[in-house]
Amino acid sequence: PAHHEICSLSWSALSLWILRGEYLMIQQIQLVLSPPTDVRIPQSWSYRLYGWLMSQISSEFGEQMHLQGEHPIAHFLCFSPEKQSLIWTVNLLNDAARQVVSPVLESAKEIPLHELTLPVSEVRTFPAVSAEELIRSGRSRSETRAKIAFLSPCAFKQSGRYTIFPQEALLLQSLIAHWNAAFPEYALIDPDALQALQQGLHIVDYNLHTTRYLLKETRIPAFQGNVTIEARLAPPLLELWNALLSFASHGGVGIKTTLGMGGAATDFYKKTPVI
């Protein structure tokens, strides 16, 4: 497929996508789980939940997904203090995943695992969104600061090693890679625009701790917490950055988002003046 560049010079391709009716949609579904009160469920159990999900869908879809190297599902598990329950957030990042996986999640009453069965007390299905809507959301925002919360263990891989601090370049590269995988028709490939984006981003605050994500027999070095990023960008690039941030809660950040890592949420706000 033809790639459309989104850069500092032009967003004109947007109207062309709208005329073509090319709305690639992604969707988020949350399952509120109610484990026994005396059982502590680690976040790494999202990998087991994913195993259950794969067992519920057609083997043909699963095989096709793995053969093509696609990762159309990003998910994570976290505890909600308000609900006093576990929330499994599952993001379906292409139309095939939405059609195949969403009926399984929406009809789930319980999830049997080897150790125990997790009752599903509530299913929340959020409206599907398109790249065009995320871009429009980016256009509507004028905030220059954003706080990214890493809700499940997050890590990057650089030169064959795990990196456990969210540098600006790694964050940007990860968000763009996930965006391009979900929206290949809207791929962000203009190197000049991407370099300008990177130069305008600065981490100005962070509250992080290191952790480990247990995956089979491997303990992956990772981090959790939050970072605040200030964007000093020309308006078209700020729109693009804000669109990527809006997408972060769907596509996740960093490596192994298909296996429960890199769950994220974003808050936008204006810079507080220094008195």
Where does each model-flagged region fall?
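RNA-interacting cores
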Residues: 10, 14-275
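Low-complexity, intrinsically disordered or signal/transmembrane-proximal segments
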Residues: 3-4, 23
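Selective for proline/serine-rich intrinsically disordered segments
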Residues: 1-2, 14
